[in-house]
Amino acid sequence: LEKVSSSKPINKISEDSTNLYINEYNKKRDELSLNVQSLNEGIAITKMAQNSIEKQQEYLGNVQTKLENANSYEDKNDLKQSINEDLRNFNQVAYETKFKKENIIATNYYDDKKSIDINTKNANFSIEKPNTPTYANEIFELSNNSDLNNSTNLEQVSSKVRTSSNQLKNTYDDFTEFGNKLEFSAKETIKAQVDLYNENKINKDRNFGQESTDFSKTNVNANLGYLAASQANIVQAQSVRLLS
């Protein structure tokens, strides 16, 4: 009788241990999945920003080429109008580059958020939002208030374009650094998912965590694929908006 009665608390302890493990496992699994999702969105935002900055650099390149060939414009007002068109396109890219309706490479006075923040359970990542339209606006002001028949004025505008292009390159590089940090963290998080899966498998082999069967190696591999595919879909959607 004593043996039978003593087995009850032992079984209860075993059951409690199993339930505790399952709860902890599920909590950790969900936490890692949310982390991957946040990091994935951050990486996609980075790629969107860089794609748009590349387009903006093309427009600045067009402006620079037109300034270098200013003599081909008999009426310098025609040159200004042509430059203005590129600058308008530059700004259009800036204001159409959004993620979840939020501007990424443009800000204004009324913006609540002046930075892009990616938060996970273990780390927070942040990059200041660039206000790229200021580059185009400054070139616009200088160009339209200058006599482009004057070679000195022409060089001043050209110099301003070069400076803006360099600043834009720095912004691109900042996003590269930001993206690299996110990608490293994402890989570490997915590695943690693999480790969690392996740990869970060992415990299941010992008859623990029998109820926790929905997280398999397939899920981990799927996360790797999701990371790339989801980013591609987000970036592609942005590209379609910019081209339309």
Predicted features along the sequence, with ranges:
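Intrinsically disordered, low-complexity segments enriched in Gly and acidic/Ser/Thr residues
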Residues: 163, 170, 174-198, 202-203
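Amphipathic, well-ordered alpha-helical segments in soluble domains
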Residues: 59-62, 66, 164, 192-195
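The cytosolic transmitter module of two-component sensor histidine kinases
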Residues: 18, 154-157, 217
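Polar, low-complexity export/assembly segments characteristic of proteins
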Residues: 4, 91-181
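Structural signature of extracellular appendage/secretion-system components
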Residues: 4-106, 182, 200-203
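Proline-poor, low-complexity alpha-helical tail modules
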Residues: 1-9, 191-244
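General secondary-structure propensity
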Residues: 25-29, 180-189, 208-213
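Long heptad-repeat coiled-coil stalk/signal-transmission helices of membrane-anchored sensory
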Residues: 29-32, 39-46, 142-145, 151, ...
